[in-house]
C-alpha cells in the first residue's frame, strides 16, 4: 500500500494529518479553502508541491459545491480571492503562487470566452486543479529517474552502490506521491544501487525524524536517522556519496530556499567534496526573482523551538529566532538542480527552463495572482 498525503475524488478532499505521524495515521476532510489554508499554516500538510495541490483541490471542492458568483465577474473575483488566501498561508514556497497565477488566468480566460457560463468556468478551473495531481506524480517519477542516473554517473559510474544524505521530508508525504529528493533515493533503491540513506532529524519541527524516517521504514529502504549536527561527521566517516535535498523555491541564478539547515549542509558537502543536489519540479523554480536575497523567508512561532509535545524545554524568557527556511547560494549546489526536464548546473537553469516554465505568453514580469 502506497503512502498518500492527499486523498481526492470529485467533491471530496482528505489530507493525512502529518502532525500526528508517526504515531497515528489520521485523515482529515477539507471542504473549503479556509480549512485548507488553516491546515497548510498549521503544517498538517507541508512540502511545496503538496501545499499547492491541497490548496487548488480545496478550491475545486468549493466550486463543485457551487461557491462563487452570482455572475461571471463575481465568480472570477471569488476564485482569485480564495487563491490569494492560499498563497498567504505559507509564502516562501513558490508552487502555490504559481498555481494561483495559472488558475486565476484559467478562470478569467474561460469567463471571457463567447458563450461562457458560471458552470463552464467552474468546470474549467476544477479540471485544471485535478490535472495537477497526475502531473505532479509524473514529474516526481521523472525527477527520481533523471536524478538517480545523473548521481550514479557522477559518483559511481562503474556500477557500485551509493550512500545518500537527505534533509527534511521530500517524499510521498510532501507531494502527490513518490517524492523529489526522496524520489531520487527511492529510484536508486529500485535500481539496486542504493547502499544506505542518512536522514537528518530536521529540527525544530523534526520532519526528518517524524516523516522521512517513517517513509523509509515503510518502504523498507536502508536508512539511519542522525541529528542535524552529525551531518559533517557522517560525510567525514560514513562514506556519503552525495547530498540530495528538495526545494521550496529556486530562483533564476540557482539560489535555493529550502528547510532551515540546508545551507550548512551545502557548506559541509563542499568542504568534503561531496556533490550537493537540489531536486525540485519546475513548478518550484521562480525565474521572476534574480537572487535568493529577494526570497521572503517565513518565520515560525517561537513555541516550535522552545516546546516539545507541550513540554517547555528552553528557559523562560530566552529570545527565539525561528526561520522556517534558509537560502543556499547557487555556487554550493555542486551536483546540479534535478527537475523533471533534466539535471542542470545552476547557471544553466534560466535558459533551460524559460521556454517550458513561462510558456503560453508568460514572461518574467507576469504577476503570480
From Swiss-Prot:
Gene Ontology CC terms: cytosol; fibrillar center; nucleoplasm
Please name the SUPFAM superfamilies in this protein's record: NagB/RpiA/CoA transferase-like (SSF100950)
InterPro entries, alphabetized: IF-2B-related, IF-M1Pi, IF_2B-like_C, Initiation_fac_2B_a/b/d, M1Pi_N, NagB/RpiA_transferase-like
Name the site position(s) for Transition state stabilizer: 168
Describe the family membership recorded for this protein in Swiss-Prot or TrEMBL: Belongs to the eIF-2B alpha/beta/delta subunits family. MtnA subfamily.
Q: What does this protein do?
A: Catalyzes the interconversion of methylthioribose-1-phosphate (MTR-1-P) into methylthioribulose-1-phosphate (MTRu-1-P).
Q: Where is the active site?
A: 248 (proton donor)
Q: Which residues carry this modification: N-acetylmethionine?
A: 1
Q: What's a single GO BP term from this record?
A: L-methionine salvage from methylthioadenosine
What Gene3D superfamilies would the database entry show? translation initiation factor eif-2b, domain 1, Translation initiation factor eif-2b, domain 2
Q: Which UniProt keywords are present, listed alphabetically? A: Acetylation, Amino-acid biosynthesis, Cytoplasm, Isomerase, Methionine biosynthesis, Methylation, Nucleus, Phosphoprotein
| Record's protein name | Methylthioribose-1-phosphate isomerase
Q: Which organism is it from?
A: Mus musculus
Q: Where in the cell is it found?
A: Cytoplasm; Nucleus
Task: Please state the Enzyme Commission number of this protein.
Answer: 5.3.1.23
Sites of the modification Phosphoserine?
A: 366
Which PANTHER family does this entry report, sorted A to Z? METHYLTHIORIBOSE-1-PHOSPHATE ISOMERASE
Q: What is catalyzed by this enzyme?
A: 5-(methylsulfanyl)-alpha-D-ribose 1-phosphate = 5-(methylsulfanyl)-D-ribulose 1-phosphate
- Modified residues annotated as Omega-N-methylarginine in this record: 158
GO MF, one term, reads: identical protein binding
Provide the gene name from the record. Mri1
Q: In which pathway does it act?
A: Amino-acid biosynthesis; L-methionine biosynthesis via salvage pathway; L-methionine from S-methyl-5-thio-alpha-D-ribose 1-phosphate: step 1/6
Amino acid at each position: 500500500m502506497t503512502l498518500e498525503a492527499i486523498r481526492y475524488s470529485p467533491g471530496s478532499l482528505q489530507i493525512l494529518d502529518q502532525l500526528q505521524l508517526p504515531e497515528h495515521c489520521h485523515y482529515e476532510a477539507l471542504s473549503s479553502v479556509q480549512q485548507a489554508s488553516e491546515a497548510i499554516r498549521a503544517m498538517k500538510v507541508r512540502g511545496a508541491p503538496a501545499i499547492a495541490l491541497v490548496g487548488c483541490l480545496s478550491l475545486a471542492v468549493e466550486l463543485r459545491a457551487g461557491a462563487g458568483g452570482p455572475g461571471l465577474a463575481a465568480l472570477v473575483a471569488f476564485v482569485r480571492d480564495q487563491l490569494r488566501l492560499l498563497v498567504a498561508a505559507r509564502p516562501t514556497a513558490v508552487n502555490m503562487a504559481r498555481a494561483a497565477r495559472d488558475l486565476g488566468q484559467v478562470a478569467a480566460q474561460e469567463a471571457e470566452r463567447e458563450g461562457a457560463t458560471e458552470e463552464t468556468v467552474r468546470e474549467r478551473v476544477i479540471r485544471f486543479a485535478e490535472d495537477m495531481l497526475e502531473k505532479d506524480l509524473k514529474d516526481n517519477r521523472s525527477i527520481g529517474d533523471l536524478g538517480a542516473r545523473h548521481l550514479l554517473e557522477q559518483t559511481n559510474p562503474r556500477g557500485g552502490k551509493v550512500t545518500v544524505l537527505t534533509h527534511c521530508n521530500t517524499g510521498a508525504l510532501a507531494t502527490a506521491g513518490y517524492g523529489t529528493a526522496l524520489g531520487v533515493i527511492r529510484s536508486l533503491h529500485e535500481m539496486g544501487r542504493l547502499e544506505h540513506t542518512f536522514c537528518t532529524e530536521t529540527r525544530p519541527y523534526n520532519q526528518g525524524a517524524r516523516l522521512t524516517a517513517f517513509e523509509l521504514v515503510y518502504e523498507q529502504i536502508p536508512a539511519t536517522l542522525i541529528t542535524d549536527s552529525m551531518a559533517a561527521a557522517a560525510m567525514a566517516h560514513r562514506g556519503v556519496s552525495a547530498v540530495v535535498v528538495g526545494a521550496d523555491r529556486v530562483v533564476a541564478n540557482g539560489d535555493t530556499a529550502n528547510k532551515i539547515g540546508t545551507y550548512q549542509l551545502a557548506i559541509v558537502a563542499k568542504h568534503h567534496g561531496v556533490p550537493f543536489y537540489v531536486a525540485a519540479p519546475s513548478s518550484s523554480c521562480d525565474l521572476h526573482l534574480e537572487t535568493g536575497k529577494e526570497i521572503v523567508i517565513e518565520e515560525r512561532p517561537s513555541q516550535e523551538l522552545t516546546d516539545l509535545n507541550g513540554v517547555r524545554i528552553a528557559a523562560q524568557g530566552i529570545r527565539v529566532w525561528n526561520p522556517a527556511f534558509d537560502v543556499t547560494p547557487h555556487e554550493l549546489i555542486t551536483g546540479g538542480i534535478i527537475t523533471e526536464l533534466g539535471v542542470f548546473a545552476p547557471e544553466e537553469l534560466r535558459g533551460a527552463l524559460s521556454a517550458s516554465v513561462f510558456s503560453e505568453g508568460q514572461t518574467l514580469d507576469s504577476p503570480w495572482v
